[in-house]
């Protein structure tokens, strides 16, 4: 009987919330891990409490140490435990999206940041800000454009404009995207604010928010995020914008958004709202549909054409992958262009290795007990210093 009463009570609460918010869609739950901030646990808790004050259609779950708060808390003691619990709660469906700090994504997944530009106060998505979409720069930026489009559409922009920051490879990216568009995948190209126009963007266009989606490589995007979020504070406290955004990738099914260790209360609050909206609008379904449409327009052959002329001819024997094992140890200092070589060097030496991307750059992941040996092998091979 008590279970029935609880069910009835929950139903009436949901109806009351729906009447109050005007939305009869089910509530989503957004998690946030509270360990890892340079400003302390209370910084992220305050951000969550700020987001909860005007939360529309979502609840917030804190993942971290016990604190005095009215919000739900799932207790963990360390960052590693927090990330494991976050993954467990996401995979079980208990939470629908999560905001966290210092999380490693696999190669192929990158995050799309969201900022407010100072020129006109316009919001802009920066694609991308952490992670590596591909080892080859131009291919990565083409994928980044798709990730930005997916995220912007998931936030309610039906036809987001796309600009390409004027970096090495920008023209090749532009050609690839225009070929994709010509094959039937709809892309609306932005126009530079400068007199000569075009979809390749200048610094002026960054400040003015000339594009809904600004395409860049992740390292440049990461710097841009830090400038946009902390130019008023001197750098140690990121107080503006919505954080580094969700990890997007083909077949990636967790909605995980990234904060910097320097992100302050307002950014944490905004990141939670960002995460809620993505979950409410079903970013995973939108991503699946966009990847399907892009592939139908020849994405894979376009990407293969980009790398055809840049791949080194290889006369080396095929390196066999050693048996898989748990890889929790990390080795940093590897250039993104050398990740594949690093992995093969270790495989050849009989050490199972995977590549990934940490918040500070590319990493090679090996078994904890083999980190020292693997690091020496990579150093001897000239891959790390």
UniProtKB/Swiss-Prot annotation:
It comes from Peptoclostridium acidaminophilum (Eubacterium acidaminophilum). This is Glycine/sarcosine/betaine reductase complex component C subunit alpha. Keywords: Oxidoreductase. Gene3D superfamilies: Isopropylmalate Dehydrogenase. InterPro entries: FA_synthesis, Gly_reductase_pC_asu. The active site is at residue 359. GO terms for molecular function: acyltransferase activity, transferring groups other than amino-acyl groups; betaine reductase activity; glycine reductase activity; sarcosine reductase activity. It catalyses: acetyl phosphate + [thioredoxin]-disulfide + NH4(+) + H2O = [thioredoxin]-dithiol + glycine + phosphate + H(+); acetyl phosphate + methylamine + [thioredoxin]-disulfide + H2O = sarcosine + [thioredoxin]-dithiol + phosphate + H(+); acetyl phosphate + trimethylamine + [thioredoxin]-disulfide + H2O = glycine betaine + [thioredoxin]-dithiol + phosphate + H(+). Heterooctamer of four alpha and four beta subunits. Component of the glycine, sarcosine and betaine reductase complexes, together with proteins A and B. GO terms for biological process: fatty acid biosynthetic process. The keyword Amino-acid biosynthesis does not apply. Its EC number is 1.21.4.2, 1.21.4.3, 1.21.4.4. In the first step of glycine, betaine and sarcosine reductases, the substrate is bound to component PB via a Schiff base intermediate. Then the PB-activated substrate is nucleophilically attacked by the selenol anion of component PA to transform it to a carboxymethylated selenoether and the respective amine. By action of component PC, acetyl phosphate is formed, leaving component PA in its oxidized state. Finally component PA becomes reduced by the thioredoxin system to start a new catalytic cycle of reductive deamination. The keyword Oxidoreductase applies.
């Amino acid at each position: 009987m008590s279970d029935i009463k609880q069910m009835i009570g929950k139903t009436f609460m949901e109806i009351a919330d729906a009447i109050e918010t005007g939305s009869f869609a089910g509530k989503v739950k957004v998690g946030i891990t509270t360990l890892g901030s340079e400003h302390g646990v209370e910084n992220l808790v305050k951000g969550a409490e700020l987001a909860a004050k005007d939360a529309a259609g979502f609840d917030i779950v804190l993942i971290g140490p016990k604190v005095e708060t009215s919000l739900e808390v799932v207790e963990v003691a360390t960052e590693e435990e927090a990330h494991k619990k976050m993954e467990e709660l996401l995979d079980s469906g208990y939470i629908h999206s999560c905001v966290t700090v210092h999380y490693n994504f696999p190669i192929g997944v990158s995050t799309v940041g969201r900022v407010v530009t100072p020129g006109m106060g316009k919001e802009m998505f920066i694609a991308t800000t952490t992670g590596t979409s591909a080892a080859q720069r131009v291919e990565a930026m083409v994928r980044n454009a798709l990730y930005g489009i997916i995220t912007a559409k998931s936030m309610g922009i039906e036809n987001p404009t796309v600009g390409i920051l004027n970096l090495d490879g920008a023209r090749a990216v532009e050609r690839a995207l225009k070929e994709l568009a010509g094959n039937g995948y709809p892309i609306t190209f932005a126009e530079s604010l400068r007199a000569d126009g075009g979809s390749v963007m200048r610094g002026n266009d960054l400040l003015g928010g000339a594009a809904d989606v600004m395409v860049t490589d992740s390292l440049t995007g990461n710097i841009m995020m830090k400038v946009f979020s902390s130019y008023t504070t001197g750098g140690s406290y990121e107080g503006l914008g919505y954080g580094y955004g969700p990890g997007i990738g083909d077949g990636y099914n967790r909605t995980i958004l990234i904060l910097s260790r320097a992100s302050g209360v307002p950014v944490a609050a905004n990141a939670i709202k960002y995460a809620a909206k993505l979950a409410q609008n079903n970013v995973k379904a939108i991503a699946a549909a966009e990847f399907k449409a892009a592939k139908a327009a020849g994405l894979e052959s376009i990407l293969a054409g980009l790398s055809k002329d840049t791949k080194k001819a290889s006369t080396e024997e095929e390196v066999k992958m050693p048996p898989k094992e748990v890889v929790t140890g990390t080795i940093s200092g590897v250039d993104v262009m050398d990740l594949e070589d690093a992995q093969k060097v270790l495989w050849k030496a009989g050490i199972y290795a995977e590549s990934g991307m940490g918040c500070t750059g590319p990493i090679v992941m090996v078994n904890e007990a083999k980190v020292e040996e693997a690091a020496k092998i990579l150093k001897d091979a000239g891959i790390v210093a």
